[in-house]
Amino acid sequence: MSKSINLKQRPVGTPTLSDFEFNELDNDLTVSEGEVLLEAKYISVDPYLRGRMSDAKSYVPPFKVGEPISSGIVAEVLESKHEDYKKGEFVSGLLEWKEQQISNGEGLQKVDKSKAPLSAFLGIVGMTGLTAYLGLHEIGNPKKGETLVVSGAAGAVGSVVGQIGKILGLNVIGIAGTDEKIDMLKSEFGFDHGINYKTTDDMKAAIEEAAPNGVDIYFDNVGGPISDAVLFNINQFARIIICGAISVYNKTETPMAVAVQPFLVKNSALMQGFIVRNYADKFPQAMKQLSTWLGEEKLTYKETIVEGFENTPQAFLDMMDGKKKGKMIVKV
């Protein structure tokens, strides 16, 4: 019997295991014409899911209490009555946290495990890579020789942003929360500089030291005081990509930030929110470039793989707490 993981209640502040519940599904998994039966193989857990657990208005609807959570999943086709999919093929898509489920095929993409490991289609050649590539290119408009700062740099998106920056000839500075992560950024991902925000008393000064010529592009994954410190160091015509704000996702009230307008006005800087699905028409080209770079070994990636469907909620909590390297994925 297949199981699902549902949102039991809306978290107040930091989510806990009690906010999730397991449900045994007794629904019919008979495949009708135009449908496929899927079995989950890998589940992506991501910071944006925290926002969907609240009922606040956002760019995607909130999860419903008592119903399954959904995220990016790679699944195997167990049975098919859909003309586009065959038994034994693998697909990725936004699917519910269920061991098995029926799909009408909408939103599914075939994945070729001969080109990359299945888990990579949730990461570097999936939405993670697309977010990094398109955010940097479409808003960052990078030019060789410029300085790029990445917060949440040891995370799934941040680590790819930094590597793309190096491919494009940028000076790349990464911000992360442990010395081990800083070492990884420089030794494995090729970042030029790293700043441990947890052991740095004056982030403004640390950024100024690492970027004596100022910051041209800031890829913001965290928000909060770290991002405030970067603003003090931006150059004229700087571009700031707002991709996430994990530092405030668990806050019951969003804290007041430094007033950004003076920094933007005096530097003629651009600050823009980024949602990857708004650039869906550019996915094929971006995927092609990411796959090429991966094949040329210009890109590398880190994954934290958690074994077992039953451990998905804990994997989400650990991801939110920074207890991972690179992309957090559950192997079902």
Q: How would you label these PLM feature ranges?
A:
Residues 29-45, 53-97:
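Glycine-rich beta-strand-centered segment in the early N-terminal region that forms part
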Residues 152-153, 222:
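NAD(P)H cofactor-binding loop motif with strongest signal on the N-terminal glycine-rich segment
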Residues 71-76, 84-152:
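NAD(P)H dinucleotide-binding glycine-rich loop of Rossmann-like/cofactor-binding domains
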Residues 298-305, 313-332:
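C-terminal capping/lid region of NAD(P)-dependent oxidoreductase domains
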Residues 154, 158, 162:
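N-terminal Rossmann NAD(P)H-binding glycine-rich loop of SDR-like oxidoreductase domains
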Residues 166-229, 277:
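Adenosine-nucleotide cofactor-binding segment
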Residues 225-298, 332:
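Glycine-rich phosphate-binding loop and adjacent beta-alpha segment
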Residues 128-131, 156-157, 226:
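Hydrophobic/small residue at the entry helix of a nucleotide-binding pocket
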